[in-house]
């Protein structure tokens, strides 16, 4: 009897190790600390290999925009014989890279892929066609692709070819990994993440305005990873004037995000660091008709992209701005705004996710700034609500993440 318990066939759950039994005499069973269990229709194996595909997809983080993150694993006799991920737009998809890496013939194998295989010709041929041609017998898909060009067509093509298809393995994990793509492909608007660092009592600066640094070095390093992952970074003019930031990614080999400055009256100093075009990062300034036309021309002459929106109470129309940025293929924005811009973003409904770094300190002071300012709300029933909350430690700080559940109503 063969007890095939090489590392590739271990599955960790609740701090226990499960080992899949590949002996034909015990097909459909697995071995866990001396006890035989049912596999429950291969669910355990499917989750294990889909998790592998998710991990592969993550390698492309920050490089595939506006394409999705996709990972693929080819499995034969319960062993991985090929794997791949989508690296960047215009290059082979995850399924193709998995085939290219295969160590043996793939005919009769199972493919695990985090997102439905494409069925249309774009910059690359349809992956569904290649899967059929290669003789794959079963495909396990994390989630369907909402792209109108795909939207179930890839799965249907596989089924029509007689291939067994299962959809929904680790679907929530696959969905969260591609939350940016899933919004952008449908709405053509950026996925917006509001990021802030604060004290335990919600302060982002002292009474004198000092804010560097409330959070730990480890938390700030994590923020630079976010800057590498997302397409754009957005701040208000008050942040530019107060801090004169570069708004770049400090990770070696990382990618600088597109810098987006919200400046309703075009108060930005000509010598601001974000206007330094020697950096590879592009700078966009969003303003209104209140801006000086000569200054607009001067900034455009420096290579700055100026977007003029209709104003709302003298401020940039953030909803319109998101539409314009989407047309520029900016699929995600890390909002590192001050209190006023953060409130405006929440009030306008453009924020999708909130990430708050909380430092173990108390600052106090009625005049100390908080992460969200603006007019605020009068009734708790109107307060913004978060769902799917998670938190974890980053050094001495806590990172709290949540998704916007509903929009706020202005106090007025």
Where are these regions (language model features)?
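Proteins enriched for Cys/Gly/acidic motifs involved in redox and nucleic-acid/cofactor modification
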Residues: 63-66, 155, 169-197
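Short, compositionally biased leader-like segments
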Residues: 39-52, 156-173, 359-361
């Amino acid at each position: 009897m063969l007890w095939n318990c090489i590392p590739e066939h271990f599955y960790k759950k609740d701090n226990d190790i499960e080992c899949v039994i590949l002996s034909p005499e015990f097909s459909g069973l697995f071995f866990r600390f001396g006890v035989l269990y049912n596999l429950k229709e291969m669910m355990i194996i499917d989750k294990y290999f889909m998790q592998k595909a998710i991990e592969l997809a993550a390698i492309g983080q920050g490089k595939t925009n506006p394409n999705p993150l996709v990972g693929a694993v080819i499995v034969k006799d319960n062993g991985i014989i090929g794997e791949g991920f989508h690296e960047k737009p215009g290059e082979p998809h995850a399924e193709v890279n998995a085939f290219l890496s295969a160590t043996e013939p793939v005919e009769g194998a199972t493919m695990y892929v985090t997102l439905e295989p494409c069925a249309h010709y774009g910059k690359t041929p349809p992956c569904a066609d290649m899967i059929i041609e290669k003789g794959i017998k079963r495909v396990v898909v994390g989630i369907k692709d909402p792209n109108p060009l795909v939207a179930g067509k890839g799965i249907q093509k596989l089924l029509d070819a007689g291939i067994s298809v299962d959809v929904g393995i680790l679907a929530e994990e696959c969905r969260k990994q591609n939350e940016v793509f899933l919004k952008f492909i449908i709405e053509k608007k950026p996925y917006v993440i509001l990021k802030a660092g604060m004290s335990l009592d919600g302060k982002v600066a002292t009474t004198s305005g000092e804010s560097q640094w409330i959070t730990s070095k480890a938390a700030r390093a994590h923020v630079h990873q976010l800057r590498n992952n997302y397409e754009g970074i957005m701040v208000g003019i008050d942040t530019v004037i107060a801090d004169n930031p570069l708004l770049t990614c400090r990770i070696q080999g990382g990618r600088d995000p597109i810098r987006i400055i919200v400046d309703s009256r075009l108060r930005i100093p000509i010598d601001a660091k974000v206007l330094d075009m020697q950096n590879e990062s592009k700078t966009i300034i969003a303003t209104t008709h209140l801006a000086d036309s000569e200054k607009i021309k001067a900034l455009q002459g420096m290579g700055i992209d100026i977007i003029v929106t209709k104003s709302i109470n003298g401020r940039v129309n953030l909803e319109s701005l998101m539409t314009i940025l989407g047309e520029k293929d900016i699929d995600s924005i890390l909002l590192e705004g001050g209190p006023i811009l953060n409130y405006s973003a929440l009030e306008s409904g453009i924020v999708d996710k909130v990430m708050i770094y909380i430092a173990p300190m108390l600052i106090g002071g009625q005049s100390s700034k908080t992460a969200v300012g603006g007019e605020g709300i009068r009734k708790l029933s109107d307060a913004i609500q978060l769902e799917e909350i998670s938190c974890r430690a980053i050094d001495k700080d806590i990172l709290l993440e949540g998704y916007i559940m509903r929009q706020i109503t202005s106090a007025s």
